Every structure is written in structure tokens, then in C-alpha cells.
From Swiss-Prot:
PROSITE patterns: ZINC_FINGER_C2H2_1, ZINC_FINGER_C2H2_2. Residues 1-40, 353-388, 400-532, 565-621 are annotated as: Disordered. Activated by C-terminal proteolytic cleavage by signaling protease (probably palB/RIM13) at neutral to alkaline ambient pH. This is pH-response transcription factor pacC/RIM101. A zinc finger (C2H2-type) spans 53-78, 89-113, 119-141. Residues 400-421, 433-472 have a biased composition (Polar residues). GO terms for biological process: positive regulation of transcription by RNA polymerase II. The keyword Metal-binding applies. Binds to DNA. It comes from Hapsidospora chrysogena (Acremonium chrysogenum). GO terms for molecular function: zinc ion binding.
Amino acid sequence: MSPPAPDAQPSSGSSSDNSNADSKSTTPPPPSSTTSTTSAAAISAAVVPDDNLTCRWNACNQKFPNPETLYDHICERHVGRKSTNNLNLTCQWNSCRTTTVKRDHITSHIRVHVPLKPHKCEFCGKSFKRPQDLKKHVKTHADDSVLVRPSQDNHNQGGMNYRPHLNKTPSYYDHNGQMRTQYQHHQPAHPNAYYAPQPSTNYGLYFNQPPLNNHQRTEHLGYGAPPGGYDRKRAFDMVDDFFSSAKRREIDPSSYSQIGRSLLPLHGTLSIPSGPMPATEQHYVPQPQHAGIAHAGPAPTQNPLAQQYYLPMPPNARTQKDLVQIDNLLGQMQDTIYENANHATAGVQIHHGHDHYSGYRSSQSPPIAQRGSPGGMPVGPDGYHQPVSAATMASPLTAMSSTGTPAVTPPSSAVSYTSGHSPSPSAPAMSPQSRHSSTSGSVMYPSLPTSLPAVSQGFGQSTTTTLGPSFESNERRRYSGGMLQRARAAPPRSTDNHNHNHNHGASTPKAPVSPALASPSSEVSDVSEATREREEQYDRWLENMRVIESLREYVRGRLERREYVEEQENEHQGQGEAARKERDGNPMDVDARSPRSPAREQPGRPREGSSLYPILRMPGD
């Protein structure tokens, strides 16, 4: 009954085919035993009915054995070619009447009418008529990373199972329409992730777009400018102008005001990395894992779609001599900014940050901290507070920003990090009371006013630029901020009012007054305005320190990697330009020369500006 039904179907089909062959004798009988082992063309020919293999171009009505033959017939017979003067660009399949401008377009359009699907997907085996249809379909596989469900063979490869496709490496189409191959089996890829190549270190400055990964660390000086080429070139020119001004002594390294004005155009332009160097330590916080998918392989270090733009070396920082000179000038500017830290950070509340990269320091500076943390306790990567001791806590005079920039501590070696000057719970000269006050004061402490000359001297804080406190003990303790603030809060309110009225005068801030006697609106406005000014001043100082450290790190990195032009090569490159300048009387020479000095000097004697520029010899000298 039901079993012989399939056998009867081919017989009826063959009888009908025989009748058609007797009438027209044009269509051969279909193959009697077509199986899945034949080619795709044979499969399609066995599945496609005879009505779909009939040419419907005008009144042709010719039948063909397979879709390939029908397609070739339409292209050669009805479409024609320009070389044979029979090119037809209008589709006449039934009532289509689609007109194109090229032969390739009409031949691609004909695939819509012909049941020909030569483009097969490697992943699922589905066939398509046109290559653009296959390309759109393959992108769906690229979105789900061609991963099978976790329930299928999880015990084989730990959940990272790719579908086997005829022993070929899985591939996908990227967003640019190009075929990409996946990683090898010994490098399982992260799901739903693309991996960008590491940035090259053979160039000078490179510009990048803001990355998606927040833990990126770059070895070069990057610019977080918008994608526009003008903004990247403008930032590059500003850095070069700063190097030029520093080399020509247009900026006084000992003047904080001049340094601040010269660094103001660079604020917000340089991208300060916030993670460790790739060569020292790799930190990556994985995303929440999905069920059945194992995360492994290298972590992505950068936005996959971020483009990198490389520019040549700055003209004013090409040679080794230029880099050494700029590094020395930047060091002097950094010392000047350090010395002005007491005035810039006065009255600004700075707490220990929650960044778990606090163990990394790029320069001689205390551990990382940031301003504005409510509790002042270090927070681990899991979001919980970690145990802390008095030796690891940061005081307000040793705080830093969240990007690793030192806040107040000078770069001098007057106070060592590992010597007996550093505080620790087991210090012999520390009593339990002083130890408790230094520990609690470094965690929670009020903000200090802008200027406290009498109080700071009375309580033992030093007014020198080294910011080293003086106590009755022999130890130079660096936790003076907590001690000073705790001692300031100890006297009663009446004593503070008496001292305010008789001793301090207008320079001392007002003591706390009863809320019933004070005007809340005026006090809140005055405090908010003063706090805003102090915070803006601190932000400017902090940004200056960030820019200086970034520039100095960039210069030192180039010196370590020997990314500079040799002196002899630089002389040969600038020999023609120097000859032209000498002939024209050096119109662009800005070196400081004495008006009595001759225009041309002796060949054997160096110029006064030899420390800034190499000596260029003329061929006739």
C-alpha cells in the first residue's frame, strides 16, 4: 500500500516523459537513480520539475535537462553579445520587461527566473542563486561566530565547538565583504569578538579612535582626537610647537605660570593610558560568561573597528640630541609643577582610588589615588573592599589621580619609600595613639582651607617646597595631613571662635556657627564657589602633570627604542636647506646671537646654538 507508492511515482513520471519524447523528442528521460552522492547540478535537476526547466523567453518554450543548460541557453541565445551585434538588455521572461545597462546585470537578473543555485554556503549547505545573496547569508553565520549549541558535544572541546565542514577551516565575511578565516584550533577565539592586530612600534606618534576596552595601555603617545584628519594633524602640530618652544627657551622651566600657559592647548588632547604596560602585566576583566561557552585565548586589547593613523616623527624631536634636551627640559618643568603642588591642592579632598592597577607606577611617584572617593578604601576588581594597613594608606599629601599622576609628592629623594622614613605599623617611634590617628586620618578627613599660615606653622607643618613635616619625633612622617586635620578638629567650638576673633583675623576661615544664627544660602554659595575654584585649580594642575608625564614617557620610549634619526643622516638631509639659508642670509634663524658677532663664523669653531642644532658643514669649508 504505502511502501510501493514511491516505486509507482517514477513509473508514472517515466511514462509521461516517454509520451513527451514521442511527441517532441527533445527532452531526454531523467536519470532513474539520482542520489545525494551526485553533484549539486544533478540534485537540482532531479528536484526541479520540468515546468521550471522550460524557457519562457517570449515564445521559445524549449525544455532543458538541467538549470545550467537553461541558463547558458538564455545568455547565449536570447541575451546575446555586443561583439555579435545581438545584445538584448531587456528581460523578456514572461512579462518581466526589466531593462539593465550592462550584460552582466541582465545575466545576473536572469538567475531570478532560472532555478539555478550554484552558490552554496559552507556552513549550513544552503544554496543561493546569486553571490550577493550568499554573502548576505554568510554574514548571519559571522554574527553568531559559527558556534553550535552548548548541548552538542560539550565534552569534546569544552563548549568551543565549530561545525565541521568538509575538513575546511571555518570562515566568515567581515563587514567589508571579505572572507576571513577563524583562528586555529589551538587558539580558541572569544565568542562574539573580533581581534585587531597589535599596534606597530616602528613609527612615531599614532592616532587612534577611543577604544571600547577601558583597560587599554599604549606604548606610544596617542591622541584621543575625533576621526577627522584635521584634528589629528592639529594635535600633532601642537605637540611639535611645544617641543620647539621648549628647545628655544621660550618657556621658562622654573615658571609655573608659563608652563601652565604653554600646556593649556594640550589639555584634553593627549590620551593618558590607564592600565599597565603590555610588557609588564596583562589585566583583562572578562564579560559575564554564557552557559556552556568557555572563554579562553588572548584578551582583546583594543576596539576592533578602531583605526590607527601613523604620522612621522615631529620635526623638532628627530635626533637623539633633541630627545635628550627635551627630556631634560620636561624634567625641569615636572619639578616646577611638583613644587607648586602645595598651592594647587590646598583644600582639595583627595582619597584613595578604586582602581586595581594601583600597584603600577610609571615614574617616581606614590601609589594611585583619586579625588572624590567617598570612603577612601581601596576596592578590588570584584567590587569589595580589600584589607588595608597604615603602611599602604595614602595621605592627602601623597595622593595621586586615577591615571597614575602624582599629586603632591616632590620627585626628590628626601623621603624614601622603603627606608625608615616611610610609615609602618611597627615603627618604633610611633605610639598607639599616633598610629591610630595616622590610620584613621588618612581614611576620613575634612578638607583644608586655601591658606592657613599661622595654623600650619603652629601645628608643625613645614612651609618648604619639599612638603616634609616636622614632628617632635625624629621620624619624618609622610602622614602629616591626617595628624594636622585630627589635631585641628580636637579643640572645642568656643576655643575656635575665640581664636578666630583675636588671633587669626580675616585670613582664617570661619568657625562652625549654629545653624539657627547663620544664613544657609550665603554660606552654601560661598563654600560652593570657593570649592569650585579650588577644584578647577587642582584639575588644571593635575592636567599639567598628566601632559608632562605623557610627553616625557613618549620621549623616553623613543630613546629606549632608538627611534631617532642619526646625526650624520640628519646633516645630509638638511645640507641643501642650510646652504640656501646661508645664501639668503638666514631669514628664518631665530637663535640668540650677539649683534656684534659676525654673520659667518669660522669653520673650526662651533656656533652658539650648537647645543640646539647640529653643525652643518659647507662643501667648500
